[in-house]
């Protein structure tokens, strides 16, 4: 009789382990949609390793500046690329660890172009004032 409860306890522990393992998802939800032609990064823009270029999505455009995000195959690294209009060499990109809510990275490029990449479900009330929310995941300084 003691083996039945032990088996049941083992099954419950395995189930709990599997369920908690699924709850730690780190990916950015905006990358879940199908890509469109506008999502393709310009050929002259590179993304740092370990980002997968094929995951790139255009999330916002402001004053002609395009904001792309991409992530690694395991979704633990997220990247932001800020691309000014035209074939400008002034683009910049960077990556950071996507381990939970909050700021993943802040980029500052030539000419003072700045942007922050946020993880999903970030609390904007805890961020420094003076930023404009372009999307759930991208902040830029107030004009």
Where are the regions a protein language model picked out?
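C-terminal motif of bacterial Sec signal peptides marking the signal peptidase cleavage site
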Residues: 18-21
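Bacterial N-terminal signal peptides that target proteins for export
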Residues: 1-12
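Bacterial signal peptide processing site
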Residues: 23-26
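Extracytosolic low-complexity repeat regions of secreted or lipid-anchored proteins
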Residues: 78-143
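Polar alpha-helical coiled-coil and adjacent low-complexity
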Residues: 49-51, 75, 143
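N-terminal secretory signal peptides
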Residues: 30-71
């Amino acid at each position: 009789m003691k083996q039945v409860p032990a088996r049941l306890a083992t099954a419950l522990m395995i189930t709990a382990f599997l369920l908690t393992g699924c709850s730690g998802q780190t990916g950015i939800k905006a990358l879940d949609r199908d890509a469109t032609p506008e999502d393709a990064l310009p050929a002259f823009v590179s993304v740092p390793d370990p980002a997968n270029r094929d995951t790139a999505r255009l999330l916002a455009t402001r004053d002609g500046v395009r904001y792309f995000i991409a992530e690694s195959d395991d979704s633990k690294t997220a990247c932001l690329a800020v691309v000014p209009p035209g074939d400008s060499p002034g683009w910049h990109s960077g990556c950071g660890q996507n381990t939970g809510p909050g700021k993943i990275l802040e980029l500052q490029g030539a000419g003072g172009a700045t942007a922050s990449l946020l993880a999903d479900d970030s609390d904007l009330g805890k961020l420094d004032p003076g930023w404009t929310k372009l999307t759930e995941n991208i902040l830029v300084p107030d004009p």
